[in-house]
Amino acid sequence: MKNYIQYLTIGALLMGSLTSCNDFLDREPLDKVTPEKFFSAEADLAAYAINNYKFVTVDDKYGINLFGKDNDTDNQASGTSNSFWIPGEKKVAADRGEWKWEDIRSCNYFFDQVLPRYEEGAITGNQDNVKHYIGEMYVNRAYSYFQLFTKFGDLPIVTTALPDIQGELVEASKRQPRHKVARFIIEDLKKAEDMLLNNPPGGKNRISKNVAYLLHARVALYEATWEKYHRGTAFVPGGSGWPGKDAQGYDADVEINYFLDEAIAASKFVADQMVGNLAENTDTPEGMNASLVSINPYYTMFCDENMEGYKEILMWKKFDESLGVTSNLQMELCRNGGGSGWTRGMVNSFLMRNGLPVYASGSGYNPDWEKEGVVATVQNRDSRLGIFTKNSIGEYEVNPAFISDVERRYQFALSAFNGV
């Protein structure tokens, strides 16, 4: 009997130790924040939102970078050929190519977690800022959708982070006609416009109300002109050869007018604020004097270190070597123009100083100037052409006042895309 009691005691102790062990293991990790706890404060939303900024910007890679996007258009050309224009060479990717939904899923996950808590008033912090960061995420989703939209047109409209269940994924993957996708993007931006602050925490390094309106105008104008100039083709709902199953009552005139009206209204909201607030172009060949004081605000707006003071700049990226946010673009442009340059048509789109186009009678333009080189070609033009045109190859001066142990800033006596 005594042994039996001993066995029971030992067994009870073992069971107790196992239970306490399970209790010890069944705890939230101390080195990580769980989803249930993360979206509970203003700072959480701020961090998540800015981590989902996917805007195409200048990075630290060598080359012309972002500004090569216009290559192979009527405005800009590179020194290499592009197979895009060769029949049969523009092929569908063998894998998923650009069909990537990770960014949109990240936004949808945010809304799944945050919107119920926001409606319950369960997120701590400054409520104006909380509301603002939710607005930022609507812009993030709209932007990510717009990036896909310009590549594919018809898209699935997905508003939640879907589970890994085949049936649900297949149903949600059905593509909607492009005009419905564009309307969905604009609806997201309207939600953002209602929630965003004019002057957000972080200044113009973060999304603001005006940024949402700017993107709103761009999306609307893009879709209006696309549907207008592709009417009746396979690239719009119901057009000849359109691969969609159901145009769902698509009316080209109604859609085109809707998107044009949206573009006009959104543009006007921003433009009205800029009246009398644009940077002045004082028409000087240099942007700063010897003391590095701006003598041409329009010029220095494109090469300043701090863009907060320029009303017409709605959002900008701050480069900071200590934070590892750097760029090699200026060096590349100075050295060889980044292997890219403006087309003759682009240059000749700039007016003469007297306000007349180069082809007009009385403009004063001489076509023979083109034979003499860039300097002669751009003479007597709108001064903005000279600011953004490198007019001498391999010839520039560095102002020593720009160089210190802390920072390297260069002023080129001969413009080399100084504004970029």
Where are the regions a protein language model picked out?
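Short edge-strand/loop segments of extracellular domains
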Residues: 161-166
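An aromatic- and glycine-enriched ligand-binding surface/loop that stacks and positions planar moieties
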Residues: 22-83, 155, 159, 210, ...
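C-terminal motif of bacterial Sec signal peptides marking the signal peptidase cleavage site
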Residues: 17-20
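Conserved, well-structured interaction surfaces
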Residues: 40-58, 77-152, 168-209, 374, ...
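Hydrophobic helical h-region of N-terminal Sec-dependent signal peptides
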Residues: 9-14
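Bacterial N-terminal signal peptides that target proteins for export
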Residues: 1-8
